Amino acid sequence: MQKQTNWRGRLLTCVLAAGMLMTSVPVYSGSVAVEAASETKTTKIDFSTMKNLDNLPDNWKIQNGSGNSQLVDDSENGKVLKLSKTNSGNEISLKNSKLDINENEYRYVSIETKIKMGSETHANQFSIPYIKDSKGNTAYTLYADGNWSSYKSHVNGKNTLEAGKISVDKWQDIRMDIDLKKDTFRVTIDGECELAGVNARAKTDNLSEISFYADSWNTGTIYIDSVEVTAEKERTQSATFYVSNNGDDSKAGTSPETAWKSLDKVNSQHFIAGDKILFECGGEWKNQTLFPQGSGDENSKITIGSYGSGNLPKISTNGKMKD
């Protein structure tokens, strides 16, 4: 089992991974060529834009089995998918069996899901999602079972860890970040890192299938707004990234003029030895947790610091992280 640790109101340096360094760095005013991370959005499905469930995009399929699937109206998100199974029997699922993500091409994989666990009667387990390789081995898992009070995940085989609180009948943003090279992953719920650097259920060098499902005696109802799976190549050239309260997460982040805005954006990126992450002086990020992905080495650390003039930036790490 993995040790669990709560981080509440700690200093910024408490959440830095191995090979990271806190410092203040002057801004270089010249132009710098930056190698862009090669990112491929492998598959995405967004039910809010759909009129019906016919002809789903990008190899997504729904299997009703002993359950029922509907495109329903939601007061917050418009159209969403409702998957409901009230009796034991065959599997109901939303599935994509053609991810075709291989370690020799992509190192990092992120799965972002906007989901609501329904308050309808439920029993046992609903998988949200299970991810398999081309041989059918289950490599990564996230699921709800029992009284649906917390998400759970398998690590090192079938050892189980809690992976964040379930807010029944409320929309939650769930993100899984997978490192195919290290066979590790992390889970973030609504921007808070709940599991980090934990081992996969099974080691693999590829991902083939993702499935949200309930089968056999498992019952319950879930609502899905969208799912996005992104495979990303590893960067080889270090760079400097900027973060500002006046930034824009849709921009490159590689200059003060194209700075990112949120810690969520920083936390979603993969940093390498020699990278610098600089926060603008005078800025403040409240009730957010900084937990960058990646690590440096003895000779070339990842530097977290500041740029500009004025008061040093403030970050309130008022979240929870399990390691």
Where are these regions (language model features)?
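Sec-dependent signal peptide cleavage junction
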Residues: 21-39
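Extracellular glycan-recognition surfaces and repeat-rich motifs
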Residues: 51-85, 294
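Secretory/extracellular carbohydrate-interaction modules
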Residues: 82-148
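Short, aromatic/His-centered strand-loop micro-motif at the edge of beta-sheets
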Residues: 151-173
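Short tryptophan-centered beta-strand motifs in secreted/extracellular beta-sheet-rich domains
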Residues: 170-180, 185-187
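Flexible glycan-contacting loops in extracellular carbohydrate-active proteins
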Residues: 197-225
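Right-handed parallel beta-helix/beta-spiral solenoid domain characteristic of secreted/periplasmic
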Residues: 293-323
